Amino acid sequence: MKLKLLAKPIAVIGITLIGTILFILLSQPNQPSSKTDPMARSFVLWLHGLGDSGPANEPIKTLFSSPEFRNTVWSFPSAPSNPVTCNYGSVMPSWFDIHEIPVTADSPKDESSVLKAVQNVHAMIDKEIAAGTDPNNVFVCGFSQGGALTLASILLYPKTLGGGAVFSGWLPFNTSIIEQISSNAKRTPILWSHGMADRTVLFEAGQAGPPFLERAGLSCEFKAYPGLGHSISHEELQHLESWIKTRLQSSS
């Protein structure tokens, strides 16, 4: 479940559960400088997928070259190494346990390990807010297992944040979590993107997300990408950049 960044959504690269995957960084043309309203400090927390690492995902931030991101602090933490059930107990970077691959809408959930991971994510967010960042300028994003953790972290955070972006993720909890979602958390917008050719986290697992969020009282924008497998396309990241830009709060 390591991140693969594809130039085109129709290009699909096969993956193995514990193999290494080539990370392709797309070069971007220089953006002309422009005068914009003063932007306050913002924070983007990116959570990687199973078996991956934070540093391997850091090149993503170079794609966000708009002036609105000049005061953005990026964080790419790495998951701790844990035994993973779907990989026969192999120890690898993992935010929480996963019981089966492919992940479907009905896959078993390990809520206890998810909640432990959520506490760690909340600590990262709390630290940034304590440093002076407006919660409305805090964005949590994640791919695959990191996307599932993004969702859980957003829903259980006691404050309204700028937004949460889920890429090829799934619901890592049961419907009972709805009772734990605060009114503030329900005001945090969600962007959910999923490849229709995903054979690791099936598209049906992604499709189950928006109806659940709607029942919970949250706003979710769901985008399906035909031909895209278990990876992230340039198109998805371009939309993420635009989506965050429209939600950033200025310092004025």
Please name every model-derived segment.
Residues 191-194, 198:
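Short beta-strand/loop motif that positions the catalytic acidic residue
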Residues 207-252:
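C-terminal catalytic histidine-bearing segment of alpha/beta-hydrolase fold enzymes
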Residues 129, 134-185:
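Primarily recognizes the serine-hydrolase "nucleophile elbow" in alpha/beta-hydrolase
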Residues 136, 184-190, 216-219:
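Short, proline-enriched alpha-helix->beta-strand connector loops that line the catalytic pocket
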Residues 55, 199-205, 233:
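Conserved alpha/beta-hydrolase "acid-adjacent" motif
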Residues 2-44, 53-55, 72-73, 208-211, ...:
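A domain-start/cap signature at the N-terminus of enzymes
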Residues 28-137:
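Serine-hydrolase catalytic machinery in alpha/beta-hydrolase-like enzymes
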